């Protein structure tokens, strides 16, 4: 990045790859104006940042799990764990209540962050994986693209489930924007 090489000190290549797939599981007419519909959505994104030689990156240019779009519910990670490789995966079961306006969702997220792209491929283990799941409400209006969710967060450490709070399941409120790829 940077337009002025003499003044700017951080130069890097950033790569983002995204994939989405949708399956209609059920589309049953209930009335003349409404169908009971369930859609399964699978979303994945893989991001890497590669600094140029002799360039040090500040934390503001590194990747992180933000708790709103990646690893929903993990809102405290962005300030303590940043890296140069991020893989975010989501599976959602969506039920449109008012198509194009409002739907009910259930999500399961898996987010992985590593300090370097090389370590992402060579040193990945279960302690690097952050899971979250829960129900949510999605507003699909372009003027009001909000999502309200309840998220439960955990990791699998040494083969055992470790809840984020250290005690057990705890629902956390998450407010996010409903961003669609076009």
Each predicted region: which residue ranges?
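C-terminal outer-membrane beta-barrel translocator/porin domains of Gram-negative envelope proteins
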Residues: 1-101, 106-118, 122, 163, ...
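Short, well-ordered loop/turn and helix-capping segments at boundaries between secondary-structure elements
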Residues: 24-25, 150, 180
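Short basic/hydrophobic patches in alpha-helices and adjacent helix-turn junctions
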Residues: 92-96, 135-140
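Conserved active-site loop/cleft motifs that coordinate metal ions or position small ligands
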Residues: 103-107, 145-152
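Short beta-alpha connecting loops at secondary-structure transitions
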Residues: 118, 130-131, 151, 155-163, ...
